[in-house]
Amino acid sequence: YIKRFQETRLNKKDFDLLVNCIKDNNNFAMVTAFDNESYNLIKKQPIDIIKIASCSFGDWPLLDSAAQLDLPIIASTAGANLETIDNVISFLSNRDKSFAIMHCVAQYPTPDKNMNLSQIDFLKKRYSDVRVGFSTHEDPGSTDMIKIAIAKGADIFEKHIALPTEEYPINKYSVNPVQFEDWLKAASFAQDVCGVGDKRILDNKDEQKSLKSLQRGVFFKDNFDTGHVVNSE
């Protein structure tokens, strides 16, 4: 076990309090388990979603424990080779699981040059029947990556948020509440400007008015009877 996890470990009472608070605020409770034993605790909680961390993406015993629960799964793919991703998707699909995968870079924080957001395009193309999201660890003050990810079609997002304490400062990849609000505003802006992408949209009246004022037309200087034939000359 990692020392940091042991130092911040929650007991059953703590978990009950945390999950109840999540539910009381009308949010979904999502949990990441790093060992099989933790799934015994998950079974006792009203959890909505199972998260598979990138470090556990190819951990077959852990994936098997997750798949045995009747819960949707979101799995991060950082560092996984193509064969592993193919196998995990096959594993979950063959068990009729509701699941999504996340483009993710396991570098904390992730420099802009290493974000590789075009991997979202790759994953969406290769696994066209699977929802693809974005789990991000960039500089907490950045709001650019979420906008690009939305423009590329990601529709599930994971962001680390933290509150500093006297004993534990915020790490270098987690946002504080103010930064999180800015991040959400950036996401909302991106969704608004991206608009609709699954059908042709022609309902902009101002656009139609502008085009009409610029388009060529045919006009008659004399009156003609109904049925009069007009030719190109």
What does each model-identified segment do?
Residues Y1-E233:
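Catalytic cores and adjacent flexible loops of soluble metabolic enzymes
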